Amino acid sequence: MEYRKFGNTGRSHAPLGFGMMRLKRDENDQIDQAWVNETLRKAIDNGLNYVDTAYVYPGSEIATGIALSGGYREKVTLASKMPVSKLTCQEDFWKILDEELERLQTDHIDCYLMHALSRERWENYVVKFDVLSLMEQAKAQGKIRHIGFSFHDSLDAFKMILDAYDGWEFCQIQLNYLDVNYQAGLEGLELAASRGLAVVIMEPLRGGRLANVPEEIANMMPRGAVESALDFLWDRSEISVVLSGMSTTEQAEQNMEFASRASVGMLTDEERQTIIAAGDKMRAAISIPCTACDYCGICPQDIAISKIFAIRNQEQLDGDSVKAAANYKALGQRTAEKCVKCGQCVEQCPQQIQIFEELEKIHKRLG
């Protein structure tokens, strides 16, 4: 496996990182710890060495800590995140960080990110509570090793955050062949890399959407749908690690196989342009930029928001309104009909989707 330089940190990593947000769960919606142990450790044994989790991923940090026990913690770079939007005072920062260290069964987190920064979160939390100085203190104390941020907002906001601090060592952005001009996009990738930051990629398959593309799109790809989507990213020298939120053994084994042959410049010019053209065609067809992160899962009405958006986007791709209506009705009591427009989901959405407005339109169409 061809390892890549991680910015100016002195670290190097396999091209594939294990994202711990979408872990396999059992019939009671509990993380399958035995599966996590076996799958993550096997990946590490085969060269993977970057593991990404977060405070707000339900059960993830605890599961990660257990899986990395028995000597595996020392074999990886461990990344986790500070949920800045949960801060009410500076003391909260230390309480959360110490809780994360306990969950992860470690005395330090290698790569520590401010989670899901936007202009609003920067101004109302990072600046208000001087979180950068807290991050620097945590680094000086040895509780974290490298300071970074993950991001969900406009390119202008990304540039503002980059410019605001000279000590950034890495960042994490959403990027795939569908999102080349969305949020930070390719321009943000190139800018961050030009400043010496390592760049970690999330949502390489757009929450799984790019793994199951229409036949017309699949036929355009130089290789399989998943492999082509990952290769599009690994082809770029600016990218240090591509995260994949793997939830099945098959996904993990397949992605490790793809990563074993990943290299910078692996695509021909024709292959690059073909994949970009496929993205253009898909982007023209769909209207809701949902990645199925399920941060909206806090809905007090238990509406299946991400599933509803997936149904609508799939309808736009394949034109099958009959199937879309049937899939929507199959949600039973979890359709958009129950929405009371409380706005809790909108506050949590990293894609800044006006969720209840979209739900209302979809219900009128499919309900």
Task: Briefly describe each language-model feature range.
Residues M1-V76, L134, A140:
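N-terminal binding-site loop/beta-alpha segment at the start of enzyme catalytic domains
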Residues N49-Y55, R145-F149, Q172-I173, V241-L243, ...:
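Short catalytic-loop micro-motif centered on adjacent basic/acidic residues
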Residues E74-K86, Y112-H115:
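A short, structured active-site edge motif that brings together acidic residues
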Residues G19, A54, Y112-H115, S150, ...:
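Conserved residues at the C-terminal ends of beta-strands
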Residues E74-L78, G167-Q174, S263-E270:
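Short hydrophobic/aromatic-enriched beta-strand-loop microsegments
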Residues E27-N28, R41, D45, L87-M202, ...:
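Glycine/proline-rich, positively charged
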Residues I44, Q137, E187-G367:
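Structured C-terminal cap/extension of enzyme domains
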